[in-house]
């Protein structure tokens, strides 16, 4: 039975953690995750998704939430656990070389490397209109997502939002990590092709700011930034549900309401047309498109904003 230290934080990582802890070939000896964070208006201290899952279902397995992995006591604790593998999935911290040298460190990255190294591979793939994505296991080294690839699985992501793709890739990653660890000695690591490498940065709230220039680009932003940070106009109006109706039509009036429907309306971008199904003003409740227009006394040929 191989001893595993798992390092991960969000729900994506929990799916992988669950697969490992339930498999009879592995023994989870510890979880490393981010410290509890203050959440919401009341700033309630909340554990990470992985910590909540493990403490509720497997309370005997130790959980560590260090602010730094460079602490000598943390290094010693990891060494004393004597892991056969260290598995990392969306942990949120860089592993120092001293830890990388203790055991094979296998990272699960939510892209088909070397594309989209970095913090937002799923959102970046959607923004770039990729129809395929996937997950891969790689041997970690000091560079950011630069290690040799062990195995990968791909899937279709066309017209899926980030939330849906996260769930899809989490389930793929849970299968992939079992395959990689069980067959580790038989796998020949494959060096990444540096000429094909692309980088992606962390998503910020302001990335959700949109204009009505291009319907296709707005639609891809909507998919990429659901559920967070969402998409919103400069006046704070959020588009919660929308569909791409036409991506080529040139419209004379950007922001014109083209047609009212039962629970939605068609909106003109400078190029293309969107169906707005649900929207929300800042500080107010969400409304379907038609109800919102009725409340604002807006009709066909009026400007939304």
UniProtKB/Swiss-Prot annotation:
* One Pfam family this sequence matches: Formyl_trans_C
Top-level EC class: transferase
Entry keywords, A to Z: Protein biosynthesis, Transferase
- EC annotation? 2.1.2.9
Of the GO CC terms on this record, one is: cytosol
Coiled-coil stretches noted in the UniProt entry, renumbered to this chain: none
GO MF annotation list: methionyl-tRNA formyltransferase activity
Gene3D superfamilies per the UniProt record, alphabetical: 3.40.50.12230
- InterPro entries in the record: Fmt (IPR005794), Formyl_trans_C (IPR005793), Formyl_transf_N (IPR002376), Formyl_transf_N_sf (IPR036477), Formyl_transferase-like_C_sf (IPR011034), GART_AS (IPR001555), Met-tRNA-FMT_C (IPR044135), Met-tRNA-FMT_N (IPR041711)
List ligand-binding residues for (6S)-5,6,7,8-tetrahydrofolate. 111-114
Q: Which reaction does it catalyse?
A: L-methionyl-tRNA(fMet) + (6R)-10-formyltetrahydrofolate = N-formyl-L-methionyl-tRNA(fMet) + (6S)-5,6,7,8-tetrahydrofolate + H(+)
Is Transferase one of the keywords? yes
Q: What family name appears in the similarity comment?
A: Belongs to the Fmt family.
Q: What does this protein do?
A: Attaches a formyl group to the free amino group of methionyl-tRNA(fMet). The formyl group appears to play a dual role in the initiator identity of N-formylmethionyl-tRNA by promoting its recognition by IF2 and preventing the misappropriation of this tRNA by the elongation apparatus.
The molecule here is called Methionyl-tRNA formyltransferase
Q: Which organism is it from?
A: Campylobacter jejuni subsp. doylei (strain ATCC BAA-1458 / RM4099 / 269.97)
UniProt lineage: Bacteria, Pseudomonadati, Campylobacterota, Epsilonproteobacteria, Campylobacterales
